[in-house]
Amino acid sequence: MLQDIVEQWQIMQQALAPLRLTRWQLTKMFAAQVYRDHPVGALLGISLSVVLLLWVISVVTRPKKLEDVLGLPVLGGSRTLKSDFLRIIEEGKQRYPDTPYIVNASGLQYVVYPPIFFDEIKRLTEQEASAQDFFHTVTYGQWTHIGAETDALWKTIAVDLARSVPVKVPSKQKDARIAFDKYVGYCPESKPVTIFDTMMKIVATTNACSFVGREVGTGEWPQVVQQLPMSVYFAVMTLSIVPRIFRPVLLPIVLIPALLVQRKMRKILAPGIRQDMEEYERAADRKELLKPTEDGKLPFTQWLMARYKPGEATAHQLATDHLLTSFESTVSTAATLYNMILDLAVRPELQDELRQEVEEIMVDGKLPATHLKELKKMDSMMRETFRVNPFALFSLYRITRKPIQLSSGPKLPAGTILCVDSHHINNSAELFPEPAKFDPYRFLKKREEPGAENRFQFVSTGPTDPNWGDGTQACPGRFFANSTLKVCLAHVLLKYNVSLREGQERPKMVSMPNGIWAPDMAAQVLFQSRD
């Protein structure tokens, strides 16, 4: 076929020579002729040309490998180690205990610093190295809006939402009861419950009742909220295994499910946001409107409107803020609750002890309207679960916004992803004797030491508490999450006995190819009602 095409070109050149056509005109005529005579071959040639062009663009625009720029070693090069991040950081700890190294994760390169750099990295300002930029990058935030939190949203969560926690405890207790009744129900006999999926729905419902009201929160909203992170993570994981040259083409396609979910969420939110905006504009006393009450939903939309500058608080922006809040408050809280339920399921005696603590602080069946610091045993168990089964092997994720020189290692150019090895903080024998042992009262005993009463709590941050991050960019929603978790755990303890099937071991977390620990989606726990 190629010889025929060459002959056609020569014949066409000779035949059309008297017309004195330009090369471009001649090429167009020749291409049309080839397509008529060899349509399949022409399409194949066009496809190969496009692939070749993409490859050339990829090679020309490909950034230099980070190891070539920084001169740091790269770990995890073999197929076996590429996704086994636990083995990677164990190797990193052994070979480079005091210096950084590079790992490849989901198509990106991370500079991993040892734990001794924790305090130095946490002190970096957002203008120097941004956590928000990191999450925006790894979740393709230009499409999904993840990691696009505004200052108004950040302050609303860190200040207004945190202050509202005590007053909402009684209402949240009702919301948790509604959620458990719907998704677990009354179990006179042991009932197997797929634990992560169920905890996702329960957390989504309990939180949604506070943010968007009980009517919306107990409708289809929890199911839609549950779909958002799954659709985003599907896109992220898919793109991470696709060659770089095809990602721009596939990105809009693999993100279609996430965009459709967001569209549905905006549609559900629209009437409530419109009503909230009208109430805020009509309010004669906005200070009174901004006060959270025990009943009803939080004035979350109004808090945002009060913090935005004139013209910024559009209905679209407010809906985006609600989407981000739902995304960030559901998955991490549900994964933590999943692990806590499993830790209770393998320790019946712990259930009895924590149940007694809950009963001692309740009055007329109600938890106190506080931050629930009274539940010291429960808090210690939660903190120990969080230590043994954290979100990830790393912490203090950042992307540098300008060149940064730390006390050791090379100067990091702008756009570098860095993080800290938090696994070897959580599993430090120096900090936590017998770190492999689950000790539910480990932190209760630490708080009994002189001067440590307010330390070592579930929401604590610091060089020995890496999982929430630290510094000015620590997780702002941890106080709200703490309340949701304690209310849900209290409900489980009072209403159910939980266990695993006889002979079954505690399901293990799964290492993802980006250093994150993922739950076993098929894991089940037996629930049996206590009355």
From Swiss-Prot:
Sequence intervals crossing the membrane: 40-60
SUPFAM superfamilies named among the record's database cross-references: Cytochrome P450
GO cellular component term of the entry, any: membrane
Matching InterPro entries: Cyt_P450, Cyt_P450_E_grp-IV, Cyt_P450_sf
Example of a GO MF term: iron ion binding
UniProt topology in membrane: Single-pass membrane protein
Subcellular location: Membrane
Pathway participation: Mycotoxin biosynthesis
Top-rank EC class of the record's enzyme: oxidoreductase
Superkingdom: Eukaryota
Amino acids binding heme: C475
Keywords, in A-Z order: Heme, Iron, Membrane, Metal-binding, Monooxygenase, Oxidoreductase, Transmembrane, Transmembrane helix
Cofactor: heme
Biological processes per GO annotation: secondary metabolic process
Entry EC no(s): 1.-.-.-
Family: Belongs to the cytochrome P450 family.
Function: Cytochrome P450 monooxygenase; part of the gene cluster that mediates the biosynthesis of the cytotoxic leucine-containing cytochalasans, including aspochalasin C, aspochalasin E, TMC-169, flavichalasine F, aspergillin PZ, aspochalasin M and flavichalasine G. The first step in the pathway is catalyzed by the hybrid PKS-NRPS ffsA that utilizes 8 units of malonyl-CoA to iteratively assemble the octaketide chain before addition of L-leucine by the C-terminal NRPS modules. Because ffsA lacks a designated enoylreductase (ER) domain, the required activity is provided the enoyl reductase fssC.
Name the record gives this protein: Cytochrome P450 monooxygenase ffsD
